[in-house]
């Protein structure tokens, strides 16, 4: 079940018809038998299959919404990979919060995501991104969805490390195993 904002609008826009087919789904399942029974939803408009990326762009344009922060395909993939590495075991809200930290730093520092990921010492691992990580990137960077209205920029996992520096910043919230902070001003 997808949790991205786009799926909410897929069903609310009302200009697309939905066709559910029980065939092999392009998702990882536990067995070939489970794969065969997995429903796969196709969306159509005027008899043509709809590319969801085009739908979100069209919906946003029609609604007068601009993407909050335009990403290249390579940046989108790399951020999703980092979310998978940094917050793969966290709930969706945790992935949103980590993506929000990256976005906030991009906007505050005026730098691109690749520089944020390098300078701010995000994980150097780049695993295959999960669907949730891809959706979190879309929700945060395209639609401006955030986990908090506070401008969080930093986080760490206390179970994995101690960080006096993080704790010297302004604590905002904890989501599962991560503590999130906004920048302390002097």
Segments the model singles out, each with a brief description of its role:
Residues 1-12:
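Single conserved hydrophobic/aromatic residue that forms the stacking wall/gate
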Residues 2, 17, 30-31, 37, ...:
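Generic serine detector
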Residues 10-66:
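Membrane-proximal envelope biogenesis segments
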Residues 42-186:
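Bacterial extracytoplasmic/cell-wall-associated proteins, especially those involved in peptidoglycan
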């Amino acid at each position: 079940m997808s949790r991205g904002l786009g799926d909410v609008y897929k069903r609310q826009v009302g200009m697309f018809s939905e066709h559910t087919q029980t065939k092999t789904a392009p998702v990882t399942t536990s067995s070939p038998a489970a794969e065969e029974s997995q429903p796969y939803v196709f969306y159509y408009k005027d008899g043509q299959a709809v590319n969801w990326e085009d739908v979100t762009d069209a919906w946003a344009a029609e609604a007068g919404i601009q993407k909050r922060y335009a990403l290249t395909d390579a940046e989108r993939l790399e951020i999703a990979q980092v979310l998978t590495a940094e917050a793969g075991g966290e709930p969706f809200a945790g992935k949103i919060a980590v993506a929000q930290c990256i976005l906030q730093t991009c906007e505050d520092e005026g730098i691109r995501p690749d520089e944020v990921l390098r300078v701010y010492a995000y994980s150097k691992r780049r695993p295959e991104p999960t669907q949730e990580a891809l959706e979190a990137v879309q929700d945060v960077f395209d639609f401006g969805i955030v986990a908090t209205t506070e401008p969080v920029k930093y986080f760490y996992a206390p179970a994995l490390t101690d960080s006096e520096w993080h704790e010297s910043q302004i604590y905002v919230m904890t989501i599962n195993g991560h503590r999130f902070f906004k920048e302390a001003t002097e």
